[in-house]
Amino acid sequence: MKHDKDFQLTAKKLREEGQRKLTLEEKQRRRRCLEELGAPEFTEHLLQQAGCDGTRFATEVLQLNIGLYCNQACNHCHVESSPRRHEAMSSDVADKCLDILANSPSVTTLDITGGAPELQPEFRRIVRRCRELRPDVDIIDRCNLTVLAEPGQEDLADFLADNGVHVVASLPCYSDKNVNMQRGRGVFARSIEGLRRLNEVGYGRELKLDLVYNPLGAFLPPPQEALQGKYTEELQQHFGVSFNELFTMTNMPIKRFADFLSRRGELGDYLELLVRNFNADTAPALMCR
């Protein structure tokens, strides 16, 4: 990456905008936004609107964040991953997680995320061991697509296919301008190459390849079904790539995205937008309770 001009430009932008720590004044402004909003207490509101109090049920999804190192440094990242982050799950902790998985029959999905999970030292061992312990489990890899072009990852697509891993890939738009604006110059082209490589080994057909869209700014995503149709048309027509499903995600106002909103003076308006558009239908599927 030292000699990658595109990465250096992205890193420079993040040093100037996305990596600067919030000042005390900015932290106080964020706190005031929440207080002035006058939003109802969440648990009470959840009960009134959805008839749900957030009580947990049997665990079905075991989600593991196995490290924060990433070959990208996106300006919306909720966990502030970047090439400068080196926190990673140890082998001891990975073993404990695998033990929990082996002894939790209610768990049907192992959801592996990061950072770029594929670049973490324990990733492949966790995938292989999961397949041995629980061949019935759906293994999800939260992939940024450009990781497939990283040195040493030339066999990654084959590894994922051989182990029947369900790839959920982030692609915030079907145009190069919008993706590069959020993720850095050249990211869109490398993402398309990653999709093509996955298609070559069977993804988007017999192997599951889903895409995730999240907005580029302080607004809500469009209807999922309509956007999936547009993604399917644009990606197939212009790049010859296919996928299974598209999921739209609403950005959480935390970490780097919250900093971005705060510095643009949009945090209060965005919080109000989220409260106004609270969707009670999503409550039963809340992951973390």
Regions found by a protein language model. Give the residues of each.
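Structural recognition of alpha->loop->beta junctions
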Residues: L156-A169, Y203, K230-L246
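Intrinsically disordered, low-structural-confidence terminal and linker regions
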Residues: M1-E25
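Core AdoMet radical
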Residues: V61, S81-M89, S106-Q120, R131-G152, ...
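Hydrophobic, aromatic-enriched interface-forming segments
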Residues: K208-A258
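Accessory C-terminal segments flanking Radical SAM cores
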Residues: K2, A226-L227, L246-R289
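Conserved alpha-helical substructure of the radical SAM core
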Residues: L24-G114, E118-D136, C143
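Short, electropositive alpha-helical surface patch
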Residues: I126-R131, F219-Q237, R264-L274
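Generic structural signal for well-ordered alpha-helices
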Residues: L98, R124-V127, A157, I192-L195, ...
